[in-house]
């Protein structure tokens, strides 16, 4: 289970919405992450890592 989280976090750093999508699908978390990534790459990364680790 820890290796899956590690892969999701790595994907979240490279392309934030992908990591969140793998865990939550098209839920609200994905759309928030996508919006933050479009508005600024760094906020998208921070949010994605926070959502995946929390």
UniProtKB/Swiss-Prot annotation:
PROSITE patterns per record: UPF0057
Induction profile: By cold shock and salt stress.
Pfam families per the UniProt record, alphabetical: Pmp3 (PF01679)
Residues that span the membrane, as ranges: 2-22, 34-54
Highest taxon listed in the record's lineage: Eukaryota
Keywords: Membrane, Stress response, Transmembrane, Transmembrane helix
GO cellular-component term (any): membrane
Topology of this chain in the membrane: Multi-pass membrane protein
Family indicated by similarity: Belongs to the UPF0057 (PMP3) family.
Name used for this protein in its record: Low temperature-induced protein lt101.2
Native species: Hordeum vulgare (Barley)
Gene designation: LT101.2
């Amino acid at each position: 289970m820890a290796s899956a989280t590690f892969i999701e976090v790595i994907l979240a750093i490279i392309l934030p919405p992908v990591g969140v999508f793998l865990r939550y699908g098209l839920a609200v978390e994905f759309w928030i992450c996508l919006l933050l990534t479009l508005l600024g790459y760094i906020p998208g990364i921070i949010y994605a890592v926070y959502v995946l680790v929390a």
